């Protein structure tokens, strides 16, 4: 069943925004009576069907509100700005896993900086990727993407979580399941993943001073995009609904 974002529902029906309507009509060639999943982008989903087509406008009849499928834990990933299009992959997979937010961070060993308008353009691109990923996986709430932030601002945000996890290649012994044993009720979790060059010792010191816990992801060093997805998957397995 194809998923679409809708405008505000009124009296059990809603219109598809122009871009969604074009996709439904021109690409998928849907017709009145075809079943769809309607999403408002704020967490609500409905089982629906195409109720009417008028030129390029599409009305969806909302038949039944579907159960909430958001994760029971709010997960934010702070990703040291990587090179190329790795953030695209991370945004897509975090959406599928149920992550709440992605916050790109300018860390000491980042090559990419993405400042000013470049940073805003990247945020908009990542939000679009997250929205499309949410449609594909049937998730009612797209991943929230922050504009690239400086280290000091990120550090302040990190300190606000119930639990802050730092996958680090130099961490020894402590695994995520060990942290879960001590903190099973954490519901607002942050993960900090370093860029290709890794996290500096000074950054580790500042994060641990703010309450962060260093953890190992095993004896092999993972790429930054792999570490982000693996960490999120483990958190969702332990604290979430995977």
Predicted features along the sequence, with ranges:
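Active-site/ligand-binding-proximal alpha/beta "capping" segment
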Residues: 162-204, 212-216
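Mobile, glycine- and charge-enriched loop segments
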Residues: 36, 61, 69, 73-78, ...
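RNA substrate-binding interface of SAM-dependent RNA methyltransferases
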Residues: 67-165
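Generic structural signal for residues in well-ordered beta-strands
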Residues: 36, 60, 142-146, 214
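Structured adenosyl-cofactor binding patch, chiefly the S-adenosyl-L-methionine
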Residues: 201-242
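N-terminal positively charged helical leader segments and presequences
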Residues: 1-68
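Short, hinge-like loop/turn segments at secondary-structure boundaries
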Residues: 120-123, 182, 233-234
